[in-house]
Amino acid sequence: SAHVLKLINHVFDAEPGDGAVGVTALLARGRLVLLADTLVQEWPTENDLADIATRAADVAKNLGLEPRVAFCSFSNFGYPVSERAIKMSRASAVLDERGVDFEYDGEMTVDVALNPEVMKHYPFCRLTGPANILVMPARHSASISIKLLQELGHVTVIGPILTGIDRQVKLCSTNSSVNDILHMAIMAACKVG
């Protein structure tokens, strides 16, 4: 990923800096969910995670969605306790300090984030409905999640959409299908990212 960003910087004279984020769109059962960061930040800090959430929220707004961000973890709102889970919770606190204009909460498991029946067990959760943006704790967990969903099928994966750089850049891997390339071309035409 760092190599790809370096090449993009070389070709476009863009300055990706700390703001670059990879957002991947997942289409399944009539729902659109964005997953981030799928490309850039290997081990993001809580401030990085807040930046990732903000960039992903911008992509969601660009797609006509009202952003609802879940900071994902293996724990829910402090239980069980771990260093990585605390980092996800602190990212939510960073957004509190920034006063952003979209919904967010966490840390929470993916089932709590996406399933309203499970979310009901956490009445203090600030999301008004299922999350449409999942911020993952690290790039590897985001990548594993996407590859798993792709291999199991019944999910259309679009991305990663590189956002936070000076130019529109869309990336396709060497194993991209014709549909993958078409989806990215549509995203480019709609100036998403």
What are these regions, as identified by a protein language model?
Residues 1-193:
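Anion-binding alpha/beta catalytic cores of soluble intermediary-metabolism enzymes, centered on
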